[in-house]
């Protein structure tokens, strides 16, 4: 008891010093954000938050983090509920602390996959899964529960420590094993062991007294673990279970931050994740020596393929068809190793950079830096519009967004749709055309503008580009929020497109990406209501349910004089959309390729099938596809004139792009 109290006092002393150091270094008027962390993971939690605090972006944004360790008032089991209730703005959260997780909630099926024992071979495989489309699925599951998921948070995988020496997993049969979390129980039962649920502190005592034969335990980065000392002469079986962790925010608190603050936290979180992963790999690499130092034999579950097969089968029994779809997604991610990275071609140099404008219904925060000026709040305010001042990057890889500084030209932002349309149309008179770009889900204002600058140079367009920047939340967990923002944007899009149509330019082209295509089909409806056509509509990877897309084109498609759809069967983002919406989206190719009257469909599956990539932005970063998109935008060329191979299916002609 005295030892435990002494350790707690040491921990609190370290925490007090850390907080005091941050406060002393902080700037006057800094915003303090409380971060609730689980006491059982305090060491790794402190390291993660310390990494956030060191970030120059966080310091420049004037943010400070105050660590609050779970206790009797704020128990670890309630961290998820406390965040949802708004008691804290931020938390480090374990999957088991998400409300509903312990109740076999299939709305968290991908999350449970990443935390189930023996599904993923080791921590490196865990990181690959997190960075793949599967990680986006997990983020969206958290978003459906009301969390703003900002990053993953990794700690070393748990191990099984036994008091008697074991040589294979079969030797666990008949052993009584203490486990801290119920998700370990099923697979241990499959192995013939008897799991006993108890806290980590109780497990050490039970192992010492012989009340259990083994214990599931985690070794922190400092290498200290009382179970190892208690089990002298036994064995350490590593890589048993990776319990997934997250940095999450209360959604209202996240939306309420300034854009500069959100961007700083997101940037800092990327570095904190990198540091945490390095710590995990170092900790796990040290386990064989740690086992030897405690007179334990060492064995890793990574060598036991049979047990991994049993773990998958056990997990599938619990998750049913939903689990099968997610496991297939994992297998697709793991099927092949990523190819050696190839340097993309350089972007073409433009003698006369195209003019870029923006129109946004995002809240105007007034930041002097355009990158941080517009936020993500849905506030009933007039449309903001302006021209972007920029200098083209001296060197930029094809398909990448602009990297240089951006600003508001002449420091002038106009309000309302008609003045905006007038501003843009004046720039478009020379070529009698304008391109309206509607970005997709998980885009910040800054990224959408930078992508528009990049593709406008790559495509060689001469017409001005107007970025319609709707209030996407800008994080992977924001899918539901973003769908709400699409609906919120409807009246703004209506006023803007009608004002543009009234300017009587010769060609208005819509370029819509992903979820932005939902706004684009609204625009077609508004054009139909006004009785004025849109000359050119390009859908790149449209995330619109196929039935909705077909209905919209049947009702309003004749007001698109040329409509082109680019689809890809390897688009993992749209495969995820299919799972979430229980219907294939319009941009998914292959067996789900959408063919309908009034739309020229181009299947790009043969040229965009990169391993471990989402394959969702082919219209911008795959040269063969981008070249075709540029022809459509610059020349309004029909597919039959662009030298594309064609085929016929169910009476409809479609085209393909080949290597």
Spans of features found by a protein language model:
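Lipolytic serine-hydrolase domain surface
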Residues: 343-414, 419-430, 449-465, 469-507, ...
């Amino acid at each position: 008891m005295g030892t435990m109290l002494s350790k707690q006092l040491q921990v609190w002393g370290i925490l007090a010093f850390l907080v005091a150091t941050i406060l002393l270094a902080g700037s006057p008027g800094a915003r303090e954000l409380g971060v609730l962390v689980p006491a059982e993971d305090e060491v790794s939690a402190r390291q993660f938050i310390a990494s956030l605090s060191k970030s120059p972006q966080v310091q420049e944004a004037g943010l400070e983090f105050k660590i609050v360790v779970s206790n009797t008032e704020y128990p670890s089991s309630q961290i998820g509920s406390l965040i949802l209730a708004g008691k804290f703005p931020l938390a480090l959260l374990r999957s088991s602390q998400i409300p509903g997780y312990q109740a076999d909630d299939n709305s968290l099926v991908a999350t449970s996959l990443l935390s189930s024992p023996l599904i993923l071979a080791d921590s490196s495989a865990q990181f690959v899964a997190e960075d793949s489309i599967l990680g986006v699925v997990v983020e969206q599951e958290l978003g459906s529960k009301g969390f703003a998921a900002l990053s993953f948070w990794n700690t070393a995988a748990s191990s099984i420590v036994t008091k008697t020496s074991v040589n294979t997993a079969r030797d666990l049969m008949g052993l009584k094993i203490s486990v801290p979390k119920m998700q370990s129980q099923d697979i241990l039962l499959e192995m013939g062991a008897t799991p006993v649920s108890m806290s980590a502190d109780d497990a050490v005592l039970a192992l010492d007294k012989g009340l259990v034969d083994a214990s599931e335990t985690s070794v922190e980065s400092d290498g200290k673990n009382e179970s190892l000392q208690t089990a002298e002469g036994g064995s350490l079986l590593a890589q048993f279970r990776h319990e997934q962790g997250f940095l999450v925010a209360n959604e209202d608190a996240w939306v309420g931050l300034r854009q500069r603050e959100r961007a700083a936290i997101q940037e800092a979180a990327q570095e904190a994740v990198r540091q945490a992963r390095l710590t995990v790999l170092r900790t796990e690499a040290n386990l064989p020596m740690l086992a030897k130092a405690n007179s334990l034999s060492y064995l890793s579950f990574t060598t036991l393929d049979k047990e991994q097969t049993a773990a998958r089968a056990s997990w599938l029994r619990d998750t049913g068809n939903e689990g099968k779809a997610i496991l297939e997604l994992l297998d697709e991610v793991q099927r092949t190793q990523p190819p050696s990275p190839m340097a993309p071609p350089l972007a073409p140099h433009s003698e006369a950079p195209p003019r870029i404008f923006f129109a946004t219904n995002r809240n105007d925060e007034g930041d002097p830096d355009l990158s941080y000026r517009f936020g993500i709040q849905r506030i009933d305010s007039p449309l903001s519009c302006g021209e972007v001042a920029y200098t083209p990057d001296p060197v930029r890889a094809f398909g990448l967004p602009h990297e240089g500084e951006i600003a508001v030209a002449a420091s002038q932002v106009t309000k309302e749709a008609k003045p905006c349309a007038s501003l843009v149309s004046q720039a478009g008179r020379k070529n009698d055309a304008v391109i309206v770009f509607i970005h997709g889900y998980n885009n910040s204002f800054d990224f959408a503008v930078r992508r528009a600058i990049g593709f406008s140079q790559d495509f060689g367009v001469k017409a001005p580009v107007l970025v319609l920047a709707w209030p996407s939340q800008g994080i992977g967990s924001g899918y539901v929020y973003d769908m709400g923002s699409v609906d919120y944007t409807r009246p703004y899009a209506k006023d803007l497109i009608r004002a543009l149509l009234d300017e009587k330019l010769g060609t208005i082209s819509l370029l819509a990406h992903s979820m932005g295509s939902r706004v684009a089909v609204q625009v077609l409806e508004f054009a139909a209501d006004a009785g004025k056509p849109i000359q050119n509509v390009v859908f790149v990877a449209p995330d619109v349910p196929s039935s909705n897309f077909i209905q919209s084109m049947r009702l309003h498609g004749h007001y698109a004089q040329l409509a082109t759809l680019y689809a890809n069967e390897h688009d993992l983002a749209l495969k995820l959309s299919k799972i979430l919406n229980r219907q294939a989206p319009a941009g998914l190719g292959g067996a789900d390729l959408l063919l309908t009257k009034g739309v020229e469909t181009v299947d790009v599956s043969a040229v965009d099938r990169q391993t471990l990539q989402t394959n969702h932005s082919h219209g911008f970063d795959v040269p063969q596809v981008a070249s075709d998109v540029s022809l459509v935008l610059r020349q309004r060329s029909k597919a039959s004139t662009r030298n594309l191979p064609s085929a016929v299916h169910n009476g409809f002609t479609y085209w393909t792009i080949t290597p």
